[in-house]
Curated annotation (Swiss-Prot):
GO terms for biological process: NAD metabolic process; NADP biosynthetic process. The lineage of its organism: Bacteria, Bacillati, Bacillota, Bacilli, Lactobacillales. It comes from Lacticaseibacillus paracasei (strain ATCC 334 / BCRC 17002 / CCUG 31169 / CIP 107868 / KCTC 3260 / NRRL B-441) (Lactobacillus paracasei). This is NAD kinase. Its cofactor is a divalent metal cation. Belongs to the NAD kinase family.
């Protein structure tokens, strides 16, 4: 099995990565940073997001495993004191995995160029100064004219991240749906939006067409993109999926409870 270890720079992660690398070598695993079959991330959810984007062009052949060295991570199933148990699980691996939907982001600019991105959690559109104005279409049909600070489009797993902070619903990842939430929308007698999260069907897509300004900022997960003048952004569920090696089974709602409520501890 080809394995690589991807870690952040905090001391606990570096120590855990060194220990894991040593055990992998003694266990006769092939360490392959370029074309791994399994990517073990050590850190937190941010580290896993970075690894996802690092290997976004190899998603069909890679499974991810998350080890957290700080606070509990939503994508991480292992703690740094369980490194030996993780290596045993890798040795007994039979290919078991679980997959989650991803967000396909297609941006078209006023100069006729375009860019394509994949997001594990979410993508947002905001304006640097003043009120953002954008037309919103669902499956090609006009839905509303939005005015406010911004819009957030998320995956089911991303529904527990920034989208939740915007009042979005938590969506089970078995649903191939995307969710759009508003960021401080303007609502009065003149300007009206739905003022509610929108959850779309698997065959639907959301299109944003911002109007009149070139100071918009787009984010894709943790990355901030300052593009040229945006003509259109189209969001849909991607054909690609992210795969996690699943040696332990933790129900999604148990994971949500553990991350946000913690009443069982």
């Amino acid at each position: 099995m080809r394995v690589t270890v991807f870690h952040n720079s905090i001391p606990a992660s570096i120590t855990a990565a060194q220990k894991l690398t040593k055990l992998l070598k003694s266990g006769h695993f092939e360490l392959d940073e370029r074309h791994p079959e399994v990517v073990v991330t050590i850190g937190g959810d941010g580290t896993l997001l970075s690894a996802f984007h690092r290997y976004a062009d190899q998603l069909n052949s890679i499974r991810f495993i998350g080890v957290h060295t700080g606070h509990l991570g939503f994508y991480t199933d292992w703690r740094d004191f369980e490194i030996e148990d993780l290596v045993i699980a890798l040795k007994e691996d039979s290919g078991q995995s679980v997959s989650y939907p991803l967000l396909d982001v297609q941006a078209t600019y006023a100069d006729a160029t375009s860019a394509h991105y994949l997001a594990l959690n979410e993508s947002t559109l905001k304006r640097l100064n003043g009120t953002m104005r954008t037309e919103v279409y669902i499956k090609g049909d006009f839905f509303e004219s939005f005015r406010g600070d911004g819009l957030c489009v998320s995956t089911p797993t991303g529904s527990t991240a920034y989208s939740k902070s915007n009042g979005g619903a938590v969506i089970h990842p078995r649903l191939d749906a995307l969710q759009m939430t508003e960021i401080a929308s303007i609502n009065n007698r003149v300007f009206r939006t739905l003022s509610s999260p929108i959850i779309t069907a698997p065959d639907e897509w959301v299109t944003l067409e911002p109007t009149g300004r070139d100071d918009y900022v787009m984010t894709v997960d943790q990355f901030v993109i300052n593009p040229p003048t945006i003509k259109q952004i189209r969001y849909k569920i991607a054909k690609e999926r992210i795969h996690f090696a699943r040696y332990r089974h933790m129900h999604f709602w148990d994971r949500v409870e553990d991350a946000f409520i913690g009443a069982k501890h």
